[in-house]
Amino acid sequence: PCVGFGDVGITGPDERCAVIDDRIKAAFEAVLPLATDGAQHAHLAAVLLQSGSAVATNGHVLAEYWHGIDLPPMLIPKASAVAILKAGKALTGFGYSGSSATFWFEDDSFIKTQLFAEQFPNYQPLFNCEGLNPWPVPEEFFKAVRSIESFSRSGIVYFENGMLASNEQETEASTYKIEGLPEGMGFNAKYLLMVEPSFKNVHFDESSNKSFFFGENVRGVLMAIDRNSATPYNAEANEEDDNFPPF
């Protein structure tokens, strides 16, 4: 299990070895909603900060934000990233020891954090998509997701006959008309809303059962539900499913 942020002993700060800025904070802000404090696996409870980008996943959605700063790869506990954001001061420097990292602010104060030793899984294959062709998300899409979510017992929104629906059976469902959506896919509404700020352009890929989304400096992938499964979808059970391929 992951060690709690408050249980880790902290020594003196790591010496500055690089100049950084608030692009790191923008990256944390974009991907942090996907990390989960106390998750069983470190890669689900942390942000991967690396050269050029930051990555986080909850096992169902993965997002990568490009900050453009050259840094060594490190797995930062979510609580540490939250503390850096809450500090409310501009970032100016970075220190690193391999097992810890220090984030320096403009007034020479700092936040030092231990790093998880685990490796973040290879996520690049998740973005493979033949014929990728993202298009602007329909203007009413997230209004529809919110509207339908309140009527969905499973927390899933379905794409049926040019509409978002709360149930696979249209005669029993609440619906919201949205043109241009692929037929037959279904997504967890909570996960869609988590990435709404980054969900500006999207490619819904029926063959891989994923949606590939893009925003300003960010890309991501969201798994659709398996509608061919004989087991009914259970939102609470799937909250703890960390088998996000290939994780």
Please place each PLM-identified region on the residue numbering.
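DNA polymerase processivity clamps
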Residues: 1-247
